[in-house]
Amino acid sequence: MNTVRVTFLLVFVLAVSLGQADKDENRMEMQEKTEQGKSYLDFAENLLLQKLEELEAKLPEEDSEESRNSRQKRCIGEGVPCDENDPRCCSGLVCLKPTLHGIWYKSYYCYKK
C-alpha cells in the first residue's frame, strides 16, 4: 500500500512540476506570438499610412487642375427665354428671336441649332 502511495505521490509531483514548466513555456510562446502580431500590425499600419499619404499628395494636384470657375454653369433649356446679351443656353442650343409663338413675351428663346 505504501508503494502505491509513493508511486502516486511521485507521479503527482512530476505532473505538477512538468505542468508548471508547460504553463511558463505557453506563456512565453503567447508573448512571442503577440509581439510578432504587433510587429505585423505595425508593418501593415505603416504600409497603409504610406498609401494614404500618396493618395493625399495626388489630391491637391487634381483639385488645382479643375478650379471652381471651370465648371459648366447652369444652362437654359430649349424653348426657355434667354437674354440676347448674355445667352446661357445649353450646348447645342442658340439664343434666337422666335418666329411665331412667344413674340409677345420676351424677344429671345433658346432653340436647337
From Swiss-Prot:
Tissue: Expressed by the venom gland.
Main location: secreted
Cystine pairs: 75-90, 82-95, 89-110
Propeptide: 22-74
Keywords: Disulfide bond, Ion channel impairing toxin, Knottin, Secreted, Signal, Toxin
GO function terms (MF aspect): sodium channel inhibitor activity; toxin activity
Compartments where located: Secreted
Secretion signal span: 1-21
Composition-biased stretches (Basic and acidic residues): 58-69
Annotated GO CC locations: extracellular region
Pfam family membership, one: Toxin_22
Stretches for region Disordered: 58-82
Superkingdom: Eukaryota
UniProt remark on domains: The presence of a 'disulfide through disulfide knot' structurally defines this protein as a knottin.
Record family assignment: Belongs to the neurotoxin 14 (magi-1) family. 01 (HNTX-16) subfamily.
Function: Probable ion channel inhibitor.
Descriptive protein name: U11-theraphotoxin-Hhn1a
Species of origin: Cyriopagopus hainanus (Chinese bird spider)
